[in-house]
């Protein structure tokens, strides 16, 4: 009796990367690529159409983020399996992905063998987080998280706004802005405002698209 291959779907903005995944998957007798999406909205609609066993996707997709795609699909299909494939190693990125419902979080430079093993593992209900990603989680697991307001303040700082402008935009006093910044520097172990922004972007606490807006 011939085993039914795992039905795989991919979602990534970069054609070359999608083509590479397609080539890897096509060489596996136990896997079949059923759909490829280029953005978040397409990923959502194609998943609902094809119902793949495992979906491989990046965090950053146009139209709708990969994390929003996961959360929306999980809401309708609780047993759906997701494996994130990205270049982002920040602990906050990983935490958000796992919270959204991803079963694995791999970097795009992962070796082919580990990728294929991870797809099969995720399909069987296991989690897959490589050591280099797990080490980032462990490093900051005891760190005090920034509050939503502190992230707002830091986002304003990242856009180059002075305390007075931040205070006006967030409808708070300048003293409150300063207090938030003091807490931010302490929590991130940052030397100054610029250092805090750099750390927050690297860890995924601040999203690049939010900073640019």
Language-model segments: residues:
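Conserved acidic segment of CheY-like receiver
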Residues: 4-17, 21-25
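Active-site residues of response regulator receiver
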Residues: 58-59, 86
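Acidic catalytic/metal-coordinating carboxylates
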Residues: 39-42, 65-68
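Recognition helix of helix-turn-helix DNA-binding domains
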Residues: 162-195
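The feature encodes the CheY-like receiver
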Residues: 62
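Short, flexible helix-to-coil linker/hinge segments that flank and couple to helix-turn-helix
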Residues: 92-99, 103-152, 205-208
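Short hydrophobic/Thr-rich beta-strand motif most characteristic of the beta2 strand and flanking loop
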Residues: 30-38, 46, 190
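Basic, Lys/Arg-enriched C-terminal extension of HTH/homeodomain DNA-binding domains
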Residues: 186-213
């Amino acid at each position: 009796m011939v085993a039914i291959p795992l039905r795989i779907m991919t979602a990534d903005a970069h054609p070359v990367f999608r083509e590479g995944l397609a080539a890897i998957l096509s060489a596996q007798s136990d896997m079949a690529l059923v759909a490829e999406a280029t953005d978040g909205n397409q990923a959502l609609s194609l998943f609902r159409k094809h119902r793949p066993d495992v979906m491989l996707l990046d965090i950053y997709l146009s139209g709708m983020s990969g994390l929003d795609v996961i959360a929306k699909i999980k809401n309708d299909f609780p047993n759906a399996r997701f494996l994130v494939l990205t270049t982002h190693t920040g602990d906050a990125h990983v935490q958000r992905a796992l919270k959204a419902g991803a079963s694995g979080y791999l970097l795009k430079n992962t070796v082919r063998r580990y990728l294929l093993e991870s797809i099969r593992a995720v399909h069987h209900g296991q989690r897959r987080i490589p050591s280099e990603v797990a080490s980032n989680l462990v490093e900051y697991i005891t760190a005090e998280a920034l509050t939503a307001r502190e992230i707002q303040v830091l986002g304003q700082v990242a856009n180059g706004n002075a305390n007075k402008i931040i205070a006006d935009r967030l409808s708070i006093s300048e003293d409150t802005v300063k207090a938030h910044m003091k807490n931010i520097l302490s929590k991130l172990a940052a030397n100054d405002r610029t250092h805090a922004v750099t750390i927050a972007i690297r860890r995924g606490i601040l999203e690049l698209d939010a900073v640019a807006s």
